[in-house]
Swiss-Prot record:
Pfam families: AICARFT_IMPCHas, MGS. Its EC number is 2.1.2.3, 3.5.4.10. It comes from Streptococcus pneumoniae (strain 70585). Keywords: Hydrolase, Multifunctional enzyme, Purine biosynthesis, Transferase. PANTHER family: BIFUNCTIONAL PURINE BIOSYNTHESIS PROTEIN ATIC (PTHR11692:SF0), BIFUNCTIONAL PURINE BIOSYNTHESIS PROTEIN PURH (PTHR11692). GO terms for molecular function: IMP cyclohydrolase activity; phosphoribosylaminoimidazolecarboxamide formyltransferase activity. This is Bifunctional purine biosynthesis protein PurH. The lineage of its organism: Bacteria, Bacillati, Bacillota, Bacilli, Lactobacillales. It catalyses: (6R)-10-formyltetrahydrofolate + 5-amino-1-(5-phospho-beta-D-ribosyl)imidazole-4-carboxamide = 5-formamido-1-(5-phospho-D-ribosyl)imidazole-4-carboxamide + (6S)-5,6,7,8-tetrahydrofolate; IMP + H2O = 5-formamido-1-(5-phospho-D-ribosyl)imidazole-4-carboxamide. GO terms for biological process: 'de novo' IMP biosynthetic process. One of its GO terms (cellular component) is cytosol. The IMP cyclohydrolase activity resides in the N-terminal region.
Length: 515
């Protein structure tokens, strides 16, 4: 019995060669629309879909394959006499291979000028139906959705006259993943169109970006996936100019770094980061000086860290960074001379370029946190704050220099793991106290790191002080200005302690926990 294949593809890469090889193996080819035209033009004989269905393609191609002569030929079980009798009684011919890929919905909605009507018209109906029918009946039918699988199918057909069950099952699984992702993308688009912020079903689709050697630790398996609708300002979209593949921990740290620097758009800034905590932030009138400040913040912790710069890297800055062991450098661009300096004798240094002009668009994405058996979803902590809305709660007002330093500290503290404390001046971090289970321990840690540079320093806390002992520690160290959210039932005790020691303290009214 002659074997039949149905081919209907939007991605025509390799399809002519695939069909030609099938013809050599004696296969009969059914095809539709543009695919049939492409095959006919290449000299591959095909049967029109309407010759199989007895109906013409209609409604601008919306209806062409949704017919019992197609789906009966796909779904009929070869091991059931009743199915084979139904096929015979209704003059349905069996289809043994389906090669289908879908309308380019993703590519359509990514176009800057796409209309809603264009998006709707690129929702494939017949294609997913054929794929699912063939995949359901994979015991007898081979289904191909990815041109990368043409070769393995041809090899097995040439060698054995049919594909193995294992191959058909693997290809069916791929189809169900593909159609699920396709529908998830459509659901995501429509959910956004109607402004639904809390859908009762959440479907997310990501594409494999990079299989990883291991995860956070060597005993953990891991992979890196990218959103099906890519975000330009993202480590997943970064252009790697040098170095080894990014590790699991590299990616998490790099992501934290590019989030931090979004808050420092106005001035040349360098952020150094280790284990998702900033270990140095420097801000200046030029990027070289900003690097100096970030490095001087903590010359020890920066070793083996990640650095992100929000201005082009020039040769002078590259020379300074070249002398420090770094895992990753991220910047919007690099001069040719700077790149040559950084790469010299450092083939493993990972150098990434990112479009910093796409930062704002990245801020609207939701954050997803996995828990056992569930998923937490929240907006990013990108609330717009204005110092004009802050409240000085002490008798003493901040000086102009202190006010500038407090603004800088408040931007920096947002990215320190809770309980988080940071000590800064108006252009660089001096001490970081991250992740302690009580706030006074974080205060002591940050002060101890900054102890030789406390003259004129200020301190920021990511959440309120539950007791006045924090203020006591700060005053004892000689720090004269504090910024914190406020909101404790004991705020007045902290205010009184600040007044007692002549400190100025600002309440922002906004908490910045980070777990």
């Amino acid at each position: 019995m002659t074997k039949r294949v149905l081919i209907s593809v939007s991605d025509k890469a390799g399809i002519v060669e695939f069909a030609q090889e099938l013809k050599k193996l004696g296969w009969e080819i059914i095809s539709t629309g543009g695919t049939k035209v492409a095959l006919d033009n290449a000299g591959v004989d095909t049967i029109a879909i309407d010759d199989v269905t007895g109906f013409p393609e209609m409604m601008d191609g919306r209806v062409k394959t949704l017919h019992p002569n197609i789906h009966g030929g796909l779904l009929a079980r070869r091991d059931l006499d009743s199915h084979l009798e139904a096929v015979k009684d209704n003059k349905i011919e069996l289809i043994d291979l389906v090669v289908v890929n879908l309308y380019p919905f993703k590519e359509t909605i990514l176009k800057p000028d796409v209309t809603y009507a264009d998006a709707v018209e690129n929702i494939d109906i017949g294609g997913p139906s054929m794929l699912r029918s063939a995949a359901k009946n994979h015991a007898s039918v081979t289904v191909v959705v990815d041109p990368a699988d043409y070769a393995v199918v041809l090899d097995e057909l040439a060698a054995n006259g049919e594909t193995s069950y294992e191959t058909r099952q693997r290809l069916a699984a791929k189809v169900f993943r593909h159609t699920a992702a396709y529908d998830a993308l459509i659901a995501e688009y429509f959910t956004a169109q109607v402004g639904e912020s809390k859908p009762e079903k959440l479907t997310l689709t990501y594409d494999l970006k990079q299989p990883m050697r291991y995860g956070e630790n060597p005993q953990q398996d891991a992979d890196f996936y990218q959103k099906a609708l890519p975000t330009d300002y993202s480590i997943a979209s970064a252009k790697q100019l040098n170095g080894k593949e990014l590790s699991f921990n590299n990616i998490r740290d790099a992501d934290a770094a590019i989030r931090i620097i979004r808050d420092f758009k106005d001035s040349p800034t360098v952020v150094a980061l280790k284990h998702m905590n900033p270990c140095g932030i420097g801000q200046a009138d030029d990027i070289e000086t900003a690097w100096d400040y970030a490095y001087e913040s903590d010359p020890v912790s920066i070793f083996g860290g990640i650095v992100v710069l929000n201005r082009e890297v020039d040769a002078a800055t590259a020379e300074k960074m070249h002398g420090v062991f770094l895992e990753i450098i991220i910047a919007p661009s690099y001069t040719d001379e700077a790149l040559a300096i950084l790469i010299n004798k450092k083939k493993n240094l990972r150098i990434l370029a990112l479009p910093f002009n796409a930062q704002e668009a990245s801020e609207v994405e939701a954050e997803y946190t996995g828990v056992v058996g569930g998923l937490l979803v929240q907006n990013q902590d990108v609330v717009k704050e204005s110092p004009a809305d802050w409240q000085v709660v002490t008798k003493r007002q901040p000086t102009e220099t202190e006010a500038t330093a407090l603004e800088f500290a408040w931007k920096a503290i947002k990215y320190v793991k809770s309980n988080g404390i940071i000590v800064t001046n108006d252009h660089m971090t001096l001490g970081v106290g991250p992740g302690q289970t009580n706030r006074v321990a974080s205060v002591r840690l940050a002060i101890d790191q900054a102890k030789d540079r406390l003259n004129g320093a200020v301190l920021a806390s990511d959440a309120f002080f539950p007791f006045a002992d924090n203020v006591e520690e700060i005053a004892k160290a000689g720090i004269k200005a504090i910024i914190q959210p406020g909101g404790s039932v004991r705020d007045q005790e902290s205010i009184e302690a600040a007044d007692k020691y002549g400190l100025t303290m600002v309440f922002t009214g906004v908490r910045h926990f980070r777990h």
